[in-house]
């Protein structure tokens, strides 16, 4: 097909169509369904062939590549075939196509050849045949409207320098510019190049309209009037009939607005009225009959809406729709159309007014979240469609509540559908929520209802034009809001549209082109959609989208209209009826209101509107002084009756449109995963463990979910208990101190009355002390209980001896001072004891928690057959059990030590009790009750002696309970291979030492030796670990409290024999020689476990004589082993020195074993940690660091933090976010994630000026004032609820009207904000449902 360049003012005959630039012709498919709006440059190609160098017109106005934006929320994807089908060449005749010429002509026109893919055409796609009119002008266009004269097929288009009257011809389908009111005498050309006075036209200044150039035409008697924005604050009225160059077409100018005018509109019923709104937030109403001068600076009615700038204002239309029935033709209209108007504002508010009471708006709706841009009334129902910058088109019911049910569909269809409008709201909800919302995805600047009668609001059509790059006009059916009915494409983005009638619609675009479509000949979007399409839902590929096979329709089945025979249908007044005696030149809107609008034929508004008004917008008083008889009406005037058909509120059955079913791929995969997990749980343990072994990732996830990493959450309860315990102790100390002070005063005064008061105080103290003894279960032999009993006995003796007061005053004072001194010493000791008890109790609770965690982790590893890690945790658990056993035994020994005398008890408690804790009231072995509940899975480790199995049935498990109950039994250690040799060498050395001592005549005192060796022994024992040293010192009270050694001969272990070298113990009266004679190499063998070495150490430290013997022995051997200062070296002692060096090594080895046992928990855990790091066991490494780093300092703190941080990254990688959050929450360290773990900063901006709120100036000012006055409360005034830049406060609470100083606030659907406490009190406590600010609708359900 050969195409010629575009010709100006040419019509489009049948058979050809222009092809828009950058549009491809293809079929519907997967790519088109996903993003069909984007052009593919490879789908077609244009080649220009020209015989001359003159450029083509099409090339000069070539449209740039545009990438339209889409709203994925409405689910509409236009196929490219439908988009390009608007310019189909199958409708217009070819012989009248101005673009096509004969192929043989050699004119200076360029030809174009179009290459398309043969396989790209879908035979099922219906081509467009609706584009009838199109033309291009050389003037910039911004607005379009139709001429409301049925005899003239006219359009009015306006721009900055253009106001033209265009006529279209249905016969030849052409559009021509009849007259340009800016360029005179341009009735034959839209370019305006011809003029009767060319010289004058060159010197004449062209009139330019404002950038917001709106154009409207009048109705009825004023149908020849055209209103445009001549400048930003004036409205110019032109006469269409004055098209010659001699006549001046300007009728008048209306200029009262102080800022730019955004919109104006003619009244369809009262055609002499024109309304305007602008940036000054004022609505002006003008009466053209009273403004016949060339310029009018005063409107008839001015309404200040008390809101922000007005974007659009419209009168309620007054269409007359005729229909036929049994009685003939009837006309349907709306009797309120002469009085009602609405405006939409930058704030998004929609206001509805009544001209008869303009002081108060009828309705105020929060229509949009951003600025509202346009509105349009429904032709015959009280609905308004609004468009905003938020990309939404909303339908609002603005009628009276009593008639709301007439226009509300109760149930739209039998089942909910994604395409069905939401009409289940009640009448009150319709005031606050839109009846329908269409998400367009781009700002809506123009929208118009199809001028056709519709009894069901959802069968109405709505044309929408956008502000963005969408080169199309979409026509939606309200019955199907997700898929438009028609999409009318243009070359460039659309600027405006207008309905000529029910079928014909015109629009203008940025390419200065005027287009007209017949929508009856346009295919619907459903007809061009692919019937079998499945594609990705979005660009990320997170879902599939498919279309159902049932296409559906765009209409709702309407019920049949059955008007009653008694209803009289009268025609709505379509023309202005002037009274006989009325002079139209002298009649304005004020006179019309005073005379009851008798000349207009409108009914009285007195029965409808209440006389009382609320405080609202202000208005001019020019037209509001009404006489008492102002509501009288002319009896001959036509009475208007609502002829809108009344139907019953029956349920309507909707034809459900295609339902979009989205398949969420992540959700499907998640369901598959859950199904697999549920199926895997049914398998046996062997298959599960094998799968864990085969998949390291699954094993890691399982261990991360099942293992316990921290005991902090369980430790919080014990902390609170310890805190309460300490508070109780402090309170009792305060009471006791007060009581003692009072008691001392009463003793000094020696008055009988004071003595009685002292007795009462003593009774109160006794009650308090007895209560505390019962509360904390202190035994009778407890130190604190002993002191309390001693105090009671002293007071009893004091009361008994009070009758005989014949002693000396000096003796009394001395006795009082001694008692007070003893009490002070006891109080100090008691305070130290309680602090130590609290610390030890906390350590015991920590050990109990760690033991339970170790048991749990061992069971987790056992469930997956990981025996290596199972044994590791069992080893850790047993080591912790030994520590727990030692702590509980030290507590029991402290109870027995309390029976010492006063001085020894004080010294002992001050020195040694720093290592003891809170006494247990139970008998021996009862301290393991906490451990019993933690190892229920292995009860054989805690069986009593009676339940102990045989030797064949014994397993190598821990016997904590048995050992705690039988602490008096002293086990013995097994001899080793070096014991015989060591004892033999030791005996030889001692004999040589005695011989040399006899020869040299040395006389060394035993006391001196003991003192020297005690000093050396302390220096050697100092670097040893504290657990072993504490065990040696805390074992001696047990031997004193349990006299088992006196009943039978002491059975010696290897350490007893070797270290003490005396089978019968040491006697203080015997000398060293006697000890040497009692040396025996025999040993007693016992079948106890190697762990009994701890008890051997305890038995070694049970008696003081044994310790002294060992000290003397070491002092005797010191000169020979390695101390040359005690004895001079001799030539014959070289062999003995060599012998003593080997002996010294073996003795040091034995002492090291005693001081650092192999079951030391710190040493053991460090070795396990090193092994885990070397083998790469990440879970075990992190688990050890979490549990034991703060207790045993396994490694450096930086290394521990780095390891935990990497572990958190692993958890995030495998999507274990919940576990990572718990690990980070209970981690004992801070700043694990470094800079990544810092909290996000919140930046607040002023809602008035938009600046960042820092308030540094006010902060410095308040700080300086606080420093000068010394009042720190002044800084409480500082905050971020105000702005230093604009010196204004932020939004106040809607209820208490105080500033919102904190971040916690509540935002209601209407936009109001408030404190959380205020909103909670308003809605929950007072059971309110509306906004506290009085906004209509339900704000809280």
UniProtKB/Swiss-Prot annotation:
<dbReference type="InterPro" id="IPR015943">
    <property type="entry name" value="WD40/YVTN_repeat-like_dom_sf"/>
</dbReference>
<dbReference type="GO" id="GO:0005774">
    <property type="term" value="C:vacuolar membrane"/>
</dbReference>
<dbReference type="GO" id="GO:0008270">
    <property type="term" value="F:zinc ion binding"/>
</dbReference>
<feature type="compositionally biased region" description="Low complexity">
    <location>
        <begin position="630"/>
        <end position="644"/>
    </location>
</feature>
<protein>
    <recommendedName>
        <fullName>Restriction of telomere capping protein 1</fullName>
    </recommendedName>
</protein>
<dbReference type="InterPro" id="IPR037590">
    <property type="entry name" value="WDR24"/>
</dbReference>
<keyword id="KW-0853">WD repeat</keyword>
<feature type="repeat" description="WD 6">
    <location>
        <begin position="489"/>
        <end position="527"/>
    </location>
</feature>
<feature type="region of interest" description="Disordered">
    <location>
        <begin position="559"/>
        <end position="593"/>
    </location>
</feature>
<feature type="modified residue" description="Phosphoserine">
    <location>
        <position position="1089"/>
    </location>
</feature>
<feature type="modified residue" description="Phosphoserine">
    <location>
        <position position="1080"/>
    </location>
</feature>
<dbReference type="GO" id="GO:0035859">
    <property type="term" value="C:Seh1-associated complex"/>
</dbReference>
<feature type="repeat" description="WD 4">
    <location>
        <begin position="367"/>
        <end position="406"/>
    </location>
</feature>
<feature type="modified residue" description="Phosphoserine">
    <location>
        <position position="1087"/>
    </location>
</feature>
<keyword id="KW-0653">Protein transport</keyword>
<dbReference type="InterPro" id="IPR049566">
    <property type="entry name" value="WDR59_RTC1-like_RING_Znf"/>
</dbReference>
<feature type="region of interest" description="Disordered">
    <location>
        <begin position="1"/>
        <end position="39"/>
    </location>
</feature>
<feature type="repeat" description="WD 3">
    <location>
        <begin position="305"/>
        <end position="342"/>
    </location>
</feature>
<feature type="compositionally biased region" description="Basic and acidic residues">
    <location>
        <begin position="951"/>
        <end position="962"/>
    </location>
</feature>
<feature type="compositionally biased region" description="Acidic residues">
    <location>
        <begin position="753"/>
        <end position="765"/>
    </location>
</feature>
<feature type="region of interest" description="Disordered">
    <location>
        <begin position="630"/>
        <end position="651"/>
    </location>
</feature>
<keyword id="KW-0862">Zinc</keyword>
<keyword id="KW-0863">Zinc-finger</keyword>
<feature type="repeat" description="WD 1">
    <location>
        <begin position="207"/>
        <end position="248"/>
    </location>
</feature>
<comment type="function">
    <text>Component of the SEA complex which coats the vacuolar membrane and is involved in intracellular trafficking, autophagy, response to nitrogen starvation, and amino acid biogenesis. May be involved in a process influencing telomere capping.</text>
</comment>
<feature type="compositionally biased region" description="Low complexity">
    <location>
        <begin position="814"/>
        <end position="823"/>
    </location>
</feature>
<feature type="region of interest" description="Disordered">
    <location>
        <begin position="941"/>
        <end position="962"/>
    </location>
</feature>
<keyword id="KW-0813">Transport</keyword>
<keyword id="KW-0472">Membrane</keyword>
<dbReference type="InterPro" id="IPR036322">
    <property type="entry name" value="WD40_repeat_dom_sf"/>
</dbReference>
<feature type="compositionally biased region" description="Basic and acidic residues">
    <location>
        <begin position="1015"/>
        <end position="1027"/>
    </location>
</feature>
<comment type="subunit">
    <text>Component of the SEA complex composed of at least IML1/SEA1, RTC1/SEA2, MTC5/SEA3, NPR2, NPR3, SEA4, SEC13 and SEH1. Interacts with ribosomes.</text>
</comment>
<dbReference type="GO" id="GO:1904263">
    <property type="term" value="P:positive regulation of TORC1 signaling"/>
</dbReference>
<dbReference type="Pfam" id="PF00400">
    <property type="entry name" value="WD40"/>
</dbReference>
<dbReference type="GO" id="GO:1903432">
    <property type="term" value="P:regulation of TORC1 signaling"/>
</dbReference>
<feature type="region of interest" description="Disordered">
    <location>
        <begin position="789"/>
        <end position="830"/>
    </location>
</feature>
<dbReference type="InterPro" id="IPR001680">
    <property type="entry name" value="WD40_rpt"/>
</dbReference>
<keyword id="KW-0926">Vacuole</keyword>
<feature type="modified residue" description="Phosphoserine">
    <location>
        <position position="1133"/>
    </location>
</feature>
<feature type="region of interest" description="Disordered">
    <location>
        <begin position="600"/>
        <end position="619"/>
    </location>
</feature>
<keyword id="KW-0597">Phosphoprotein</keyword>
<feature type="region of interest" description="Disordered">
    <location>
        <begin position="736"/>
        <end position="765"/>
    </location>
</feature>
